[in-house]
């Protein structure tokens, strides 16, 4: 009798995706982040579901409903901080996952990469709307500032902003619709992640060498299931440590003050994972230019496959490209730091230089360096 997992219509899909999937024998721990992102998404959906049972999306009661969750609901504080810090873990895994893709040339799987860029946008939109829900000072002013950026769009900008707000300012209608979108988007993300995997399994995984690994494949289970479980345990260790010992480490103290439209916080800034994009936005004095730079800072990822000039796929054997990659990482860390600083000297000029370097590295220096490396090898 044939094994049930190979004959049952539903089990067959699971089997070919997670059990008998042929995987390269040499993929490193950098390939763990896909499964970790899946775990993060499940944690976020489950904790979010329980939070939604007690949360009220009304401007008068939103802040106090979050307080009620933390004080009166059994383990409400745990669920709330798992959800808040789970978002941070989600983005850490996302950035490392994208970084891995850049370093090892995984972007050459065009469909998989483009769905990934779409996923990144969806996760960022979800996180932004989630940050508005507690209705603290930073929630309100963050929502006001970021939605206001759309007014820079010529002709339709002002109407578009009022349409999103559902009125003439960020108010009850805005909060209600943000809650609705914040609830539905993770399920759209889950569906997109399924498509992401579907396209990935069409080609098979890349590997650190960037070479074809068809001659040396091993089954996903038990080798990579065990490896993924180790990654998940480490993720849970870091997340629970953060939640139980320093739950507010990555948050903003201003968000413990209820939203007040009459009192602007001294420094309006988003969550830490948006600071690099926020720094790029602020480094351009023109409003429309800033908005374009903000969108392009993420959208530039979609262009990377077309700028791949090297004859090799991975950066594993390309030391000059490796140098530029790590300069890009340092540049992004600099932008993250600048995004959290006030708009004054010397932070303005540092932010502007870091923003120029970011686009220069991706669009100009990396492709040219790849051509130079080809010439060195007489290719």
Swiss-Prot record:
One of its GO terms (cellular component) is respiratory chain complex III. Its cofactor is heme b. Its main location: mitochondrion. A ubiquinone binds at residue 201. The chain crosses the membrane at residues 33-53, 77-98, 113-133, 178-198, 226-246, 288-308, 320-340, 347-367. Heme b b566 binds at residues 97, 196. Binds 2 heme b groups non-covalently. Keywords: Electron transport, Heme, Iron, Membrane, Metal-binding, Mitochondrion, Mitochondrion inner membrane, Respiratory chain, Transmembrane, Transmembrane helix, Transport, Ubiquinone. The keyword Cell inner membrane does not apply. The cytochrome bc1 complex contains 11 subunits: 3 respiratory subunits (MT-CYB, CYC1 and UQCRFS1), 2 core proteins (UQCRC1 and UQCRC2) and 6 low-molecular weight proteins (UQCRH/QCR6, UQCRB/QCR7, UQCRQ/QCR8, UQCR10/QCR9, UQCR11/QCR10 and a cleavage product of UQCRFS1). This cytochrome bc1 complex then forms a dimer. Belongs to the cytochrome b family. Heme 1 (or BL or b562) is low-potential and absorbs at about 562 nm, and heme 2 (or BH or b566) is high-potential and absorbs at about 566 nm. PANTHER family: CYTOCHROME B. This is Cytochrome b. It comes from Sorex vagrans. The gene is MT-CYB.
């Amino acid at each position: 009798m044939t094994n049930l997992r190979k004959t049952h219509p539903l089990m067959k899909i699971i089997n070919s995706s997670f059990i008998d999937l042929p995987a390269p024998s040499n993929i490193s721990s950098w390939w763990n982040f896909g499964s970790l992102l899946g775990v993060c998404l499940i944690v976020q959906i489950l904790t979010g579901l329980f939070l939604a049972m007690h949360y009220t999306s009304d401007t008068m009661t939103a802040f106090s409903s979050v307080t009620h969750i933390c004080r009166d609901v059994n383990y409400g504080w745990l669920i709330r901080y798992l959800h808040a810090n789970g978002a941070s873990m989600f983005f850490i895994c996302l950035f490392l996952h994208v970084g891995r893709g850049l370093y090892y040339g995984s972007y050459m799987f065009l469909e998989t990469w483009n769905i990934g860029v779409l996923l990144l946008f969806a996760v960022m939109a979800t996180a932004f709307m989630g940050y508005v829900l507690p209705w603290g000072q930073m929630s309100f002013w963050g929502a006001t500032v970021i939605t206001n950026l759309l007014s820079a769009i010529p002709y339709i900008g002002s109407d578009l902003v009022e349409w999103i707000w559902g009125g003439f300012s960020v108010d009850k209608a805005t909060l209600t619709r943000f809650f609705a979108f914040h609830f539905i988007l993770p399920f759209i993300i889950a569906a997109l992640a399924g498509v992401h995997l579907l396209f990935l399994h069409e080609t098979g995984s890349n590997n650190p060498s960037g070479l074809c690994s068809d001659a040396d494949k091993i089954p996903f289970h038990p080798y990579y299931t065990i490896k993924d479980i180790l990654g998940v345990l480490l993720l849970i260790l870091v997340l629970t440590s953060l939640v139980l010992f320093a739950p507010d480490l990555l948050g903003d103290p201003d968000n413990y003050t209820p939203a007040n439209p009459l009192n602007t916080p001294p420094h309006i800034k988003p969550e830490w994972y948006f600071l690099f994009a926020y720094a790029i936005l602020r480094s351009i004095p023109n409003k429309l230019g800033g908005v374009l730079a903000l969108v392009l800072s993420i959208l530039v990822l979609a262009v990377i496959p077309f700028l791949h000039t090297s004859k090799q796929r991975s950066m594993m054997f390309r030391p000059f490209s490796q140098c530029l990659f790590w300069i890009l990482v340092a540049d992004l860390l600099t932008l993250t730091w600048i995004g959290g600083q006030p708009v004054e000297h010397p932070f303005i000029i540092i932010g502007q230089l870091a923003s120029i370097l970011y686009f220069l590295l991706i669009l100009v220096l990396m492709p040219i360096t790849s051509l130079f490396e080809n010439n060195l090898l007489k290719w």
